[in-house]
Amino acid sequence: MGSLLFSWKGTQQKDVTIKSDAPDTLLLEKHADYIASYGSKKDDYEYCMSEYLRMSGVYWGLTVMDLMGQLHRMNREEILVFIKSCQHECGGISASIGHDPHLLYTLSAVQILTLYDSVHVINVDKVVAYVQSLQKEDGSFAGDIWGEIDTRFSFCAVATLALLGKLDAINVEKAIEFVLSCMNFDGGFGCRPGSESHAGQIYCCTGFLAITSQLHQVNSDLLGWWLCERQLPSGGLNGRPEKLPDVCYSWWVLASLKIIGRLHWIDREKLRSFILACQDEETGGFADRPGDMVDPFHTLFGIAGLSLLGEEQIKPVSPVFCMPEEVLQRVNVQPELVS
């Protein structure tokens, strides 16, 4: 597999070539085995070096196992004890024991506990107070006490509170104003007002607007066109112009299109072929691109992307929360999407 510049309608684009012998069927059992064994290898270099994002790693692994109907293979009690140990006095939750709390890992922990129907393991009132404390006067959210502002954190805040049934704990109107101020002329969203549109930020902002019932504020046709332009001749999707395709954008772009009701605008079969080509036939798991090293992050978003494409072997996934739809139905959290 190599990258190349591909001429498409007169414009050169970065893309990848997919070999003729690339996998074209879903290797579900291998992926389940890969994830089940990943967390057990606690002395591996890769495992040790990912401690700084452990909570999100647990979320990726559990969610993809649940989507594949394999959640029972994970160590529930060990995970619940770990999450409880990561909650700080301020209410926030950290990536790992001894690390600083952050909104990203607080959301991951709440998603995990929602999967397991075990939110009672943590002090919910303190989590709510922590999220409240990070909202600024303009409605934006910092990720932690150090103050970085990003629309990702706006999404983390409302997603966390929605799962806990506490969305009214923040100033929702001001939060909406801030996110809308990050909308660009091309229909997309950036991390702050005036920042470049990016598929990851668009997912966070459309997800935020779905949770807060504000999708009518989005120009779905304009944004849908920008998102569809992310598809390359290989079938893969990139996050912004002039970038290579990456399996994770099979989630960020595809989920955004689903939220705004424009999923049918892309070539679904070519995208499906690209995602399947990113599997490792020997070890299981998905990589960012065909032939690269696999990891739990891309494995979740490859499987979740296939779910949005209607893969029958995978449970239906929520495009807003990246969790099984059945879990969101159980907790009665069902954001309204554009039809």
Swiss-Prot record:
The modification Phosphothreonine is found at residue 11. The enzymatic reaction requires the aid of a Rab escort protein (also called component A), such as CHM. One of its GO terms (molecular function) is small GTPase binding. Binds 1 zinc ion per subunit. One of its GO terms (cellular component) is Rab-protein geranylgeranyltransferase complex. Geranylgeranyl diphosphate binds at residues 198-200, 240-243, 249-252. Ubiquitous. Detected in all the major organs in adult animals. GO terms for biological process: protein geranylgeranylation. It is an enzyme of class 2 (transferase). Belongs to the protein prenyltransferase subunit beta family. This is Geranylgeranyl transferase type-2 subunit beta. The gene is Rabggtb.
